[in-house]
């Protein structure tokens, strides 16, 4: 049996909310002057008690059950709702201000555009801790991320959180390993974040903070199969060329013209094979390649991992210098010429491309490498590059005499600077 009636244990009853409403504030927020009597009548009809009133405004007690009305703007909204939005006339003149998008806003906007593009290409975004293991920078002997430039935490929570990351590589690899261990082996990740550098040469007692800097980066990881096999086709493994295509799509998306970029061999020892995308002034925009066997063994990864590091700050600065112009499609035809060049094995295509653009700045539109041959029937220490050159004049049709003169000049410069020979 129930021995007693219901007892309400309520030691601290909810109190009504005190709100001060200023008439001038209400007029400014509504956009129209409403009489004080009208405001008071509406407030009392909404069960708000007027505690005190003066020429400037009223002090109200809002019922405790009205948890959505606790600020002056909430009271004004309730009053306007009863008064009627249709009773507030739209002024004939509206005041507005224009804001100019700054560099940080543009970088953030570009970041979002690229993130949407990567998600559309099958990537998943990851987020790792900016704090990292000190052993990553002491054990691997990294030529681009030496231990001396690591920002160390004075009182770390654990050995795994002892330094600020110099690169986003290790956090990403931890995510890759975690997923592989959970039987998810076909992965495409991207991450946006900052890296942190200490430069002891910039340190001074007057301004020690100058020794520390941070840079924005975007990292990309691809590993596993590109396409799962079925009865219709075999498995297709991911490759460095897939990542290269993704990176070049990113450059296009942010407005970086391909002819403003030079591709060079990367000496970063995190890669077994790698390349870097640089401006013609030598600023690194992207480094990408196949992760070294040493790193894969350290993380107990058996499959190839393809990694790209986009230097976001450098990329945004380079894009800012690009002058985008819109012109009509040329009425005059382009001309294509191919050269088979015999060069030393240590000569890179980027050197040929650079010399070509220096030789002919106006009419040379593109330089493309379409074949590389090393092997029999070539002198020792030599390789063959097959290169395509596109020439075009926007004002007239090029004749054979002009084309031959440009090609002779190109061959002469390639011969003198790279010791190149025609095959």
Feature-to-residue mapping (PLM):
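C-terminal effector modules of nucleic-acid-centric enzymes and ribosome-associated factors
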Residues: 1-5, 20-23, 28, 36, ...
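Flexible, glycine/charged-enriched surface loops at secondary-structure junctions
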Residues: 1-9, 51-54, 90-91, 125-129, ...
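Short, structured patches in soluble enzyme cores that scaffold and shape functional sites
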Residues: 23, 62-64, 155-157, 194, ...
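A carboxyl-terminal module marker
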Residues: 45-48, 68, 72, 202-206, ...
